[in-house]
Design a protein with these regions (language model features):
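C-terminal alpha-helical interaction appendages
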Residues: 1-94, 106, 118-137
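Catalytic and binding regions of secreted/periplasmic enzymes and modules that target cell-wall glycans
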Residues: 102
């Protein structure tokens, strides 16, 4: 993982944190984001969206989602949601899988359920364990 990729992992983690500041239901926001055109743009080798900043990215997701973005539901702690956002982006760089494919393997419920166990692990180990959980389904 290079420095730029790690910075983009941090940006995505902070983007997810901003959804907490906006009091968006976390599960709905994460699902919407991971299946969005914004996430797809971040998956590309180079896209201007990667350097747009988390505030702009959040506005893009909210605008594109329209009424589909649920403002109800549990709002996760910033620690949990940052880790989820960071790991999802790290996973993309680690495996080159799309955000949509990653979300299919580890939906938000899986990420939240395993946070306490996995957040202290090296990202690669957590990702491999999450992939193993998916394979066992």
């Amino acid at each position: 993982m290079n420095e730029i990729q790690l910075k983009l992992c941090d940006i995505q983690g902070r983007l997810f944190e901003l959804s907490v500041d906006r009091q968006l239901g976390s599960a709905g926001f994460i699902k919407t984001f991971m299946n969005s055109e914004t996430a797809k743009a971040l998956d590309s080798t180079y896209n201007r969206m990667q350097w747009a900043g988390e505030e702009y990215l959040l506005e893009e997701v909210i605008e594109a989602a329209g009424d589909k973005l649920d403002e109800t539901g549990e709002v996760y702690s910033k620690d949990v949601i940052y880790w989820i956002g960071y790991i999802y982006r790290y996973w993309h760089y680690y495996t080159e899988e799309s955000s949509k494919a990653i979300y299919k393997q580890a939906p938000v419920e899986t990420m939240k359920r395993n946070y306490l166990m996995f957040h202290t692990m090296a990202p690669e180990v957590a990702i491999e364990d999450l992939k193993e959980i998916y394979k066992q389904k």
